[in-house]
Amino acid sequence: MPTTTGTAISDDIYGYNFVTRGAVSWDREVWVGGENKGDSGHGTHVAGTVAAVNNNGVGVCGVAGGTGRNDGVKLMSCQIFSGNDATSGAITTSAEAIKYAADNGAVIIQCSFGSKAGTYTSDSAYERGSGVQYNAIKYFIESQNCDAVDGGVVIFAAGNDATAMSGYPGAYHDYISVTSFSPDYLPAYYTNYGPGCNISAPGGDYKISADAAKTYAEVLSTVPSELSEYNGADYGFMQGTSMACPHVSGVAALGLSYALEKGKKFTLDEFKTMILTSVNDMETYLDGSKTGLVLADYRKKMGTGSIDAYQLLMQVEGTPCLRAKVGTKQLVALTKYFGGSASNLTYLRVEMTRENMDKLGITEAPSISYGKLMIHCTKPGVAKISVTAIAGGGSVGGGSSMGGQEITKEFAVIARATENANGGWL
């Protein structure tokens, strides 16, 4: 898989602490008035969401953790927060880390940090006020460390101020800013939303949890067992757009990995567009209220929708997606894929393996009716299907006969419980 962060300063094999100018730390607790102002495990938690090893029967699965055969995403730990040192979180510290990442093979920078919403309210104000950081990110974007894309991918958390704008740097037009939704697929109570916000991902929301500890509705991931808060545990719960952001970074890593496997190469703008259009709809749910939130306030403000890894992989592959609503026999138009005369073509067959039918709970084989695909999915999921038609005439030519030629399109069917009129699904 592509490297999301690389190495080169002396003694940096396990990453580098750009605050202390030495080894990465994770257990520098600094207690002030009963509150830990030092290391919190935040970065470790984020890293686990991206890259925790899969299929090992332990803990959690990272979005890009691989199959368990040492094929997961590679991470470089560039620590910019450490203890309560004066340079912890400073713009100059992050700028140095970002440039280091570019110089040492990074393809994606996963940035679960940023300024409070409203600190900057325009791109030009951010460029002036945080010029050293802006220039470092520009340098990273212009780096070319992966054969699948011609620049660096920059992904930031939108912020946790419950404010109708993204915080910077995420709000900058060249970067991807990630908002957060909770397990009920509604906006998390804390998430920023509105201008500058590009896409949404799971970030947890303790307020909807029924358990006494109010943690199970948050995101479970890796934490440093040395921190007193976790009592020796290697896994813990956190919430925030910081937790949503690595879901998108992990999906981006999967997409680049798959592009390398398929021998594909995209411009940076093409790849970002693919990420931002690999989404499920959220608008359908934004009615009524939730824990004091007026959901209508979030309409068209959470970004393009909720990130969907499968859709990105299909975009990389070049396989179009057909969306179907669970529980309804429906006709899906094929005009977009077979041309304006799709309804008048002669269709020869629809092919879907029993395994793929089972994935969607299909008991009646899909067919063509009036030039549209008739399909009835009874459970949510994703699966492949192919449709074959004749281009030119009502029969296939060859031998002693004259006729058209077979054309076959493969599709990925995405079945979801809810349909939206704009073609989005969740």
Summary of predicted features, one role per range:
Residues 5-12, 16-21, 167-257:
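Extracellular S/T/G-rich loop segment that most often corresponds to the catalytic His/Ser-adjacent loop
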Residues 371-384:
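Extracellular/luminal low-complexity segments enriched in Ser/Thr/Pro
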Residues 104-111, 151-152, 175, 189, ...:
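C-terminal subdomain of the subtilisin-like protease fold in secreted/lumenal serine endopeptidases
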Residues 395-420:
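C-terminal edge beta-strand
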